[in-house]
């Protein structure tokens, strides 16, 4: 009898071990394979847990300005935007903004869709002043990207006497100096330095500035800029309006899209300030819509301002809010302040219209610039300017 109890006890122990092994190693059929959700989620929970859902950046308020600074979404800068085509773009009903009286020509583009949210004579050629430098910067970045003639960001560039003589906005280059190419490009993008732009063109053109300008015009045609012609790499005025660089707001919006595809260019354009010459010279960005500038607008991360007497105050602006990218181009204002305040209002209105067209009632665009005091003369026949070595001292 005692032996039976011993055998029974051993049997129970073995059975218990078998049960434990079964529980530990048995795996039920995968619920995903059976198309059965592991856990039912409410719609709100499902969206929250969906890794593909758009996550909007957290807005942080700048204590000094009281303006919410929207941090750019990293993926949006690296993405390739569809080439903008003004002729085929969806335009819907283009409103006549009551605040746009001060702009000679302009456009607001949704870079993600290519839709035109607003335009005013957007295909009309106008003087573009220093917005010219966007093409100079684009060609430089493309040369670096492809390694054209062995060019890199660290390529040493010796300053020429011709570059030193270029006037207007400048960093006072000296023929005794040599800079890495990147330093000169920063001076072009941030300070809008005309002498640096000339020096970059001379370097990339292997001594032939006008050969580089020819490349600028060829590249403009290649990417579809139909109303654009360059005479120089910096945007300073010619002796007559026929020698001024011209483009249209639609063309400049297209050029801005190509610039968006170059991280370094956008990094420079987004800097409110930067050091030059190892900190001996400060570069201050002319774009007052950037953070820590006079009229900061949430999400603005570029791109380029411009001014000569015949162009008025103009700007090409890139902005991203909630992962959505807009490009604004305005020209012809009689003051930088009016240009900046209108552009900021235009961006606010554009995002409201983009998100809810019915809600965009133009109330955000209340700035009414004074009428333009200087009317830009119509550009004469586009004849290439003769080669000149003398400096053009006119004000930028």
What is each model feature region?
Residues 4-6, 30-41, 48, 56-62, ...:
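Penicillin-recognizing serine hydrolase domain
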Residues 13-24:
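Hydrophobic alpha-helical membrane-insertion segments, chiefly the h-region
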Residues 114, 127-158, 252:
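Active-site SXXK
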Residues 146-173, 217, 274-278:
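Short, glycine/proline-biased beta-turn/loop segments that scaffold the active-site neighborhood
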């Amino acid at each position: 009898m005692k032996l039976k109890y011993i055998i029974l006890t051993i049997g129970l122990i073995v059975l218990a071990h078998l049960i434990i092994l079964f529980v530990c190693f048995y795996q039920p059929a995968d619920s995903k394979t059976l198309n059965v959700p592991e856990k039912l989620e409410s719609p709100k929970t499902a969206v929250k847990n969906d890794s593909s859902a758009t996550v909007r950046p957290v807005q942080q308020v700048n204590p000094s300005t009281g303006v919410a600074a929207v941090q750019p979404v990293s993926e949006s800068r690296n993405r390739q935007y569809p080439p903008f085509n003004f002729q085929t773009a969806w335009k819907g009903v283009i409103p006549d903004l009551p605040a746009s009286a001060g702009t000679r020509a302009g456009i607001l583009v949704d870079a993600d869709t290519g839709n035109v949210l607003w335009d005013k004579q957007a295909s009309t050629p106008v003087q573009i002043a220093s917005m010219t430098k966007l093409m100079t910067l684009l060609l430089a970045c493309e040369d670096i990207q492809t390694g054209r003639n062995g060019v890199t960001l660290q390529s040493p560039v010796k300053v020429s006497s011709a570059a030193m003589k270029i006037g207007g906005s400048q960093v006072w280059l000296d023929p005794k100096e040599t800079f890495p190419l990147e330093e000169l490009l920063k001076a072009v993008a941030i300070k809008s330095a005309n002498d640096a732009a000339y020096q970059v063109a001379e370097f990339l053109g292997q001594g032939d500035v006008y050969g580089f300008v020819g490349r600028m015009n060829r590249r403009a045609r290649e990417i579809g800029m139909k109303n654009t012609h360059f005479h120089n790499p910096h945007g300073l005025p010619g002796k007559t309006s026929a020698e001024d660089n011209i483009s249209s707001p639609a063309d400049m919006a297209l050029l801005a899209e190509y610039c968006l595809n170059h991280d370094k260019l956008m990094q420079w354009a987004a800097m409110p300030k930067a050091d030059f010459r190892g900190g001996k010279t400060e570069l201050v960005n002319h774009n007052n819509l950037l953070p820590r500038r006079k009229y900061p607008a949430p999400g603005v991360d570029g791109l380029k301002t411009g001014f000569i007497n015949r162009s008025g105050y103009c700007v090409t602006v890139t902005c991203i809010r909630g992962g959505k990218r807009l490009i604004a181009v305005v020209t012809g204002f009689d003051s930088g302040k009016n240009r900046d305040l209108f552009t900021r209002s235009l961006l606010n209105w554009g995002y409201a219209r983009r998100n809810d067209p019915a809600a965009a009632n133009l109330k955000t665009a209340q700035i009414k610039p004074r009428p333009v005091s200087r009317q830009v003369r119509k550009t004469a026949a586009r004849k290439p300017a003769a080669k000149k070595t003398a400096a053009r001292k006119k004000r930028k």
